[in-house]
Amino acid sequence: WMLQGNRGDEQRRFQTEAEEVLELSPQDRNAWLIEALGERIKQNLDDPDTWLHRARLYVERQAWDEAANDYVQVIDLSQDIEVSESIRTAARVELAALPELFRRVVELRPDASIPWIGRGQYRALRSQWEESQSDYARANPTRAITDETFAYAGLSLLTDDRQGYEQLCADLVTRDEDLKDGYAAYVAARTCSIGPATAVQPEQLVEWASRAVQQNQDAWLLNALGLAYYRAGHLQQAIEALEKSNAGRWKRLCKAQNGLVLAMAHHSAGRQEEAQQWLQQATVTIDEARPKDASKPAPAYADDWIALELLRREAEGLIRPNDTADSEEPQSDQ
């Protein structure tokens, strides 16, 4: 970052300074960098990246109050839609991992969504469903129709808040203007299919998902379309969409969502051998990815990890009812 925006002699001067800084002790280097970033902040108060760099340096010193003040600046500046999503993501992840910092930041900005979403994701990836739902609820996850909307809906199901899930989906149906956007339509289709919601007609799910796929045929959009077709009883179309999703670019673990729905679709079509094969393949993939250490995160986005848990429960209950009835193993958050 020291060399950004500098040219010629100025860049060479900064290069020399950088080499000198590397020779300092870690503590002195930290202090030098904090001071240098402070000068840069004075020149441009509106650069969240610089605030974030300095916040991390304060964290290294365990200067929690100073770090919290800088993270608050990052949060405030992140309200600008032009700010890179990577900045928001970094702030969410870093705040969630440091309780001392998180506490101070939410005291300063109790209504900011970034800290709560970050900790909700942190907890969801450790299968701490109830704690995660509580955090997402603080973030107003339905204000905009995003992956956080889906995550909160899924967490409501995982914590047996079926009424809350149904109300969320009923509210989505009324947001016609928002749902003209392909991404919002995808989120709505996925959200209301995962239950599925009784408040939404199955053909409406297909319409929303199709709207998204018309704009882009990414694997995750096709997954939502396949699930919507399955909910509407269009089994062959569901299978075709899910197989097309499997052929696209998506992480193997994420594609296990396709496998679980394919298992249910083949089961509903009377093809039990195929259903068992898809279910076995998907569950093995999930089990291989699940961290053995419960304090470690699953290697997925929070919304995908939530979807995998819900779809697995449903598929196993449908295809292996005796196994699920006999199993008394608690979920990791129960």
Segments from the language model and where they lie:
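TPR/TPR-like (Sel1-like) alpha-helical repeat modules
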Residues: 1-6, 68-80, 140-144, 157-175, ...
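Residue at a conserved register position within TPR or TPR-like alpha-solenoid repeats
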Residues: 19-22, 58, 92, 123, ...
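TPR alpha-solenoid repeat register
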Residues: 50, 83-84, 115, 148-149, ...
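"A position-specific structural signal for the A-helix of alpha-solenoid helical repeats
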Residues: 14-17, 21, 53, 87, ...
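Short coil turns that delineate tetratricopeptide repeat
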Residues: 45, 79, 110, 143-144, ...
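TPR-repeat structural position
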Residues: 27-30, 64, 129, 162, ...
